[in-house]
């Protein structure tokens, strides 16, 4: 297992780049030790990845968007680890992802039940694409594996409900850096 407690703590920020989170909220949600969580958040703040604001008794942490290059690279590293972990648990989806990447121009991520880890045997595979793709070739791959692939294709990044849903729970499969930069630049 590549992911560790520190990765779990930081994952909360990956679904909402403008979110504010307390250590106690993250610890409770992830079922982690409060002190461990607090120490790691403080460490990320010292490294310039997070900032904090105290409101009452609560210390709210958020991404340090004034330090975009460091934050982007840290997010990218964590996202790559999450993708590896996902592929270790979902070998068939890894194969499908490898095959469909050839037919995607731009960026792509998995969202929906597979990204949340709630998929069932008959779940479809939701793919969010910014750019373009060869839908006919992807449909052939879908038929080959007998898994319905549901494509959501945007020619360019745009803020809407679907984008927000895809960002909230996702696994990057192609050009993660491009989407991360779009999100960071739009403060989304």
Predicted regions and their residues:
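Catalytic core of pol beta-like nucleotidyltransferases
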Residues: 1-103, 115-121, 131-188
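Short active-site oxyanion
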Residues: 124-127
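Glycine-rich beta-strand-to-loop/alpha-helix junction loops that act as flexible
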Residues: 111-113
């Amino acid at each position: 297992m590549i992911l560790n407690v520190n990765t779990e703590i930081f994952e909360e920020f990956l679904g909402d780049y403008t979110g504010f989170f307390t250590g106690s909220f993250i610890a409770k949600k992830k079922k982690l030790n409060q002190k461990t969580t607090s120490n790691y958040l403080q460490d990320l703040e010292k490294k310039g990845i997070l900032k904090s604001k105290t409101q009452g008794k609560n210390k709210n942490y958020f991404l340090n968007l004034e330090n975009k290059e460091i934050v982007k690279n840290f997010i990218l590293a964590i996202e790559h680890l999450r993708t590896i972990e996902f592929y270790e648990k979902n070998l068939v989806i890894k194969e499908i992802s490898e095959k469909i990447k050839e037919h995607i121009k731009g960026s792509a991520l998995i969202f929906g039940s597979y990204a949340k880890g709630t998929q069932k045997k008959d779940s479809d595979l939701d793919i969010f694409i910014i750019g373009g793709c060869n839908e006919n070739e992807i449909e052939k791959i879908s038929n080959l594996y007998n898994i319905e692939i549901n494509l959501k294709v945007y020619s360019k990044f745009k803020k809407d409900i679907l984008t927000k849903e895809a960002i909230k729970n996702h696994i990057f499969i192609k050009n993660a850096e491009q989407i991360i930069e779009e999100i960071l630049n739009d403060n989304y």
